Amino acid sequence: VKQQSAQAQLREAAPAHLPRTPLNVIPAALVSASGFLLFAREDRVSGFLLLAAALVLAAMISRRLVIDLALIGVGLTAMSLVPITTDISTEHMAVMGTAMILAVGIPYAASRFLTKDHAIRFPIRTGQPWTRAEKWYLPAVLLIGYALMPVYMIRTGVYNNWPAVSDPEGIARLFLGTNVLGIWDELFFICTAFTLLRRHLPDWQANLLQAVLFTSFLWELGFHSWAPFFIFPFALLQARLFTITKSLSYIVGVHLLFDFVLFLVLIHAHNREWIDIFLY
């Protein structure tokens, strides 16, 4: 009975594909471009102007389209109004954490209680067992992270964009911040932005546009140098995995495995005698 209930909830969670027109991609792409300006370029004025233009254009096409793009815009706006950094002070974590809650919470609440279509969902228990390939991908993620993250973080010096910590409290704060941000990435870029976009666009278009947002945000956070060359494909794959598994827990698990390696690399990079297990 429980499994049947979970499967029913899973079917309900599938996003409704609304009537589409090829024009939908234009305002959607402008929203994605506004995220690039807001985060990667840190050009707030141009970003907000482009976002406004996208919503005006969307309103000319479809009422439902402008609502869904506006929900994404709310999240982008909430995050763009606070400093997006790796600062782990209590003050900054509270400010950025509040923005993260609003960026996910407002679109979810609007979808659930105002439009009442409940388009945004966070499916944790799907009732579907993971396939063998999905299970094997998890340890593969650790190996990929082990091979990639030390080379990227240390050789480029990008690790300096994160605070150097060596005391227990600092290490705990870094661990918490890294993991919370990883979970939020999946809640907003995949469960919110991608889900809303794919109601109006083919999956491949929605995926490309959310990956631009995902990559732009992490660039502002501190993933500079050649990070977009692996973050963009990672974002594409995460959305694809979510489409296949319909499981938030799975994509969060994948992300947190990468983040665990990132955390260890950061500790080692700032304290070279610690966790000396990496090749770079």
List PLM regions with ranges.
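Alpha-helical transmembrane segments and their cytosolic membrane-interface
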Residues: 1-48, 151-152, 173-178, 196-200
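Alpha-helical transmembrane segments
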Residues: 18-36, 70-78, 138-146, 207-210
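Alpha-helical transmembrane segments in multi-pass membrane proteins
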Residues: 36-114
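Membrane-embedded alpha-helical segments of multi-pass membrane proteins
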Residues: 44-54, 97-105, 171-176, 184, ...
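Membrane-helix interface "capping/anchor" motifs
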Residues: 57-72, 198-199, 203, 242-250
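Juxtamembrane helix-loop-helix connectors linking adjacent transmembrane helices
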Residues: 87-100, 109-181, 272-278
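Membrane-interface helix/loop boundary segments of multi-pass membrane proteins
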Residues: 126-130, 183-209, 243-247
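Functionally important transmembrane alpha-helices
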Residues: 207-211, 215-217, 223-280
